[in-house]
Regions:
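Short Cys/His-rich "knuckle" micro-motifs
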Residues: 132-137
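Short cysteine-rich clusters marking metal-coordination/redox-active sites
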Residues: 122-126, 143
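Short, charged, intrinsically disordered terminal tails
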Residues: 145-154
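Interaction interfaces in information-processing and related assembly proteins
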Residues: 1-113, 153-154
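Zinc-coordinating Cys/His ligand positions in small cysteine/histidine-rich zinc-finger domains
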Residues: 130, 143-146
Length: 154
């Protein structure tokens, strides 16, 4: 019996191979064997830890910049330019932190797909995502040719 995949909008994509599950609850299929899925699971977990830490550090740096500005260490006159630099650095840190947190959400979704036995299959077509793509971006959700328009991490 196959698993029916659904598009993010809820429409059916078609049948995926029926997954099997190991004792840890990792789902694998004929296209993505247990060894590969475990390797990707471990890579996703490691990347999640790294990005969560990175997001926290960047937020801490942004808050520290605000605290330093409030303590009066920053000149806000036209000659110094320090105030503008601090604002730019703070905004950059917050933007990078938000990107890291967004990637963590995508990683969590990939980990969920592993537990459902649908990892490695396009959320758009249900076709297998090439292993090389998953090795490069373990949280990838679509095939390269399906990713039309826009720049993204998937």
């Amino acid at each position: 019996m196959a698993t029916t995949a659904t598009h993010p909008d809820g429409s059916a994509l078609g049948d995926l191979p029926k997954p099997r599950f190991n004792k840890e609850g990792l789902g694998y299929t004929k296209d993505f064997d247990l060894a590969f899925v475990k390797e990707m699971f471990d890579a996703l977990q490691a990347e999640r830890v790294k990005l969560t830490g990175q997001a926290k550090r960047l937020e801490d740096e942004a808050h520290q910049l605000v605290e330093e500005a409030e303590m009066g260490d920053v000149q806000f006159d036209d000659e110094g330019g320090e105030g503008d630099t601090m604002i730019v650095e703070r905004e950059r840190d917050l933007a990078l932190s938000a990107q890291a947190r967004e990637a963590v959400v995508e990683i969590d979704e990939a980990l969920d797909r592993i537990k459902r036995g649908t990892y490695g299959y396009s959320v758009m077509s249900g076709r297998p995502v090439p292993r090389e793509r998953l090795e490069a971006i373990p949280w990838a959700t679509v095939l390269v040719e399906e990713k039309v328009g826009g720049i993204g991490r998937r």
